[in-house]
């Protein structure tokens, strides 16, 4: 089963909004996407990349084709399109062919 890892940066001045979104709206969106598309949140992590601190969100995808299905849905189009574009850019996304071991736990 593939895993999508998407990197993003939170610009200064937007941190309070980002924290609000991640604590209140993000869990609801993840549940909706999980029910509708079968994707599962693995986790959201802060990572150091060079001199910057970035964030990475990892999703367990039922198949690579699910990005095409999500891209056709206008409500989630931007997220799916970004994920589809980043498939070939290692800096932004990586897809793993197998699931990680049982030691990886999902926290919502």
Where does each model-flagged region fall?
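Short S/T/G/P-rich N-terminal loop/turn motif that feeds into the first structured element of a domain
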Residues: 1-77, 87-108
């Amino acid at each position: 089963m593939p895993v999508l890892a998407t990197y993003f940066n939170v610009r200064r001045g937007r941190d309070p909004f980002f924290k609000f979104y991640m604590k209140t709206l993000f869990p609801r969106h993840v549940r909706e996407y999980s029910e509708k598309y079968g994707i599962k949140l693995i986790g959201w992590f802060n990572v150091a990349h060079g001199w910057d601190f970035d964030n990475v969100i990892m999703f367990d995808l039922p198949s690579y084709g699910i990005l095409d299905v999500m891209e056709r849905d206008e409500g989630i189009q931007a997220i799916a399109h970004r994920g589809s574009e980043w498939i070939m850019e290692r800096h932004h996304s990586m897809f793993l062919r197998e699931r990680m071991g049982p030691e990886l736990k999902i926290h919502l």
